[in-house]
């Protein structure tokens, strides 16, 4: 694990070490708006109940395994090294009178990695370790750094997971980015590559969101001959509007396109103009902020 080079980095590269086994990996994230510290619960293999065609995690196997004490050590090592570098640079600035060196603040600690985090038996322990690291190094929940979970939303059907998430939302201000790729069973099946039931997934998302706030994230890209269009986006907007009308707390919607390679090379990103067109349909139908992310970053509406 290494610190990202200051002034370098790309949203198209979210590497997790040479063999994909790093537990802690700094990346530049479009949706975080800067430096995000990723946490990977699957250093040995990809583990997910979806097979999203756009997924950038290539199949692999490695010798590593997840251990909670190792995650704690890796987070502490990363933040200690970062603090040492920052102190050295501040000393240099004091000696030279310079103050123009770039320094990227940590926008979030994000639990994501090589699969679906809620499937891991270490999920709860990992969240607790991340929250502790944020308190130790970044000022806790009031320090300006989010604690984020990226999930495919299937865990919302499990009472143990929802109870844990609700507790983390209340105690640690956990921000949940919940995937909802589609507005009908066919669209959902194409984007998830799974047989998981669409209606049940939507119902479990809504059930949780009626109790705790979430962010909805939706991938928009070409998959073979399939491409989202304004008609489909109208159904998507109607779906979200219905959830909101029944009391779901959706903080905002993230519409984003593909930015990194996928193993099957079946997917292609949508251009900025097309993304804005589709986002306009959603914005007109829901009463929450809609943020739009192209290949290179956020697109102002």
Show which residues each predicted segment covers.
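N-terminal pre-triad scaffold of radical SAM enzymes
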Residues: 21-58, 98-101, 107-111
